[in-house]
């Protein structure tokens, strides 16, 4: 997770424009689910916030939040916006409902936080390298293009869906299994995942810490 307070201090010192992409933080981090920016108390200080509706919101599309004049500039000069279609009514309604649920049902955020800590503990017990993630996305390192795909296949065949991430999405030798946790995952499902990982970690040479 970024040291946003330090980044903000540098930007303020040098009068730099600060854009925060909080795709993995919104709906998950912060007292009210406003993301990493709320966690650091900087909601009214960053220049622009961008993110996606495809994660915590459970739909499609994305957003950019900034002062009116900046958004107007993007509307007329951003290639991504100029050559993109407007969101459908059902997409907009879905995103609005997700925002309401983030406000009204904090228990899901709390349950996800518990699952994140539980998954961390399980991976550490197995001695697996998952980087220094603080979000619901866990990159279990494999560091081999063939092995990461085979490990993902074995997991899928046993009912666990993960994304094998390899070159060119990441540099060579940095391939990983990308686990995405939700509040709906049960402890039994997470324990099953640990059991499979324990069985395959030597054969597919999952990276150890």
List the predicted regions and their residue ranges.
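Conserved PLP-binding catalytic core of the aspartate aminotransferase-like
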Residues: 110-119, 124-159, 169, 174, ...
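PLP-dependent enzyme catalytic core of the Aspartate aminotransferase-like
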Residues: 157-160, 169-209
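Active-site C-terminal subdomain of aminotransferase-like
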Residues: 14-17, 24, 29-134
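Active-site core of PLP-dependent enzymes with the aminotransferase class I/II
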Residues: 1-15, 147-148, 188
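Helix C-cap/helix->beta junction micro-motif
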Residues: 13-14, 126, 158, 204
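Cytosolic Rossmann-like ligand/nucleotide-binding regulatory domains
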Residues: 165-166
């Amino acid at each position: 997770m970024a040291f946003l307070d330090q980044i903000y201090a540098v930007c303020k010192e040098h009068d730099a424009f600060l854009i925060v992409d909080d795709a993995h933080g919104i709906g998950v981090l912060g007292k009210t689910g406003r993301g990493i920016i709320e966690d650091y108390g900087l909601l009214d200080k960053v220049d622009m916030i961008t993110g996606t509706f495809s994660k915590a919101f459970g739909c499609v599309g994305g957003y950019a939040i900034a002062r009116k004049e900046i958004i107007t500039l993007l509307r007329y000069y951003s290639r991504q916006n100029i050559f993109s279609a407007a969101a459908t009514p059902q997409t907009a309604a879905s995103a609005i409902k997700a925002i309401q649920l983030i406000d009204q049902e904090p228990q899901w955020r709390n349950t996800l936080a518990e699952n994140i800590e539980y998954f961390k503990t399980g991976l550490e017990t197995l001695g697996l390298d998952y980087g220094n993630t603080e979000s619901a996305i866990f990159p279990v390192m494999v560091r081999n293009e063939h092995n990461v795909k085979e490990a993902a296949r074995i997991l899928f065949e046993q009912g666990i869906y993960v994304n094998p991430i390899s070159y060119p999405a990441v540099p060579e030798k940095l391939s990983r299994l990308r686990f995405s946790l939700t509040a709906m995952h049960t402890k039994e499902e997470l324990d099953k995942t640990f059991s499979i990982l324990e069985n395959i970690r030597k054969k597919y040479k999952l990276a150890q810490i």
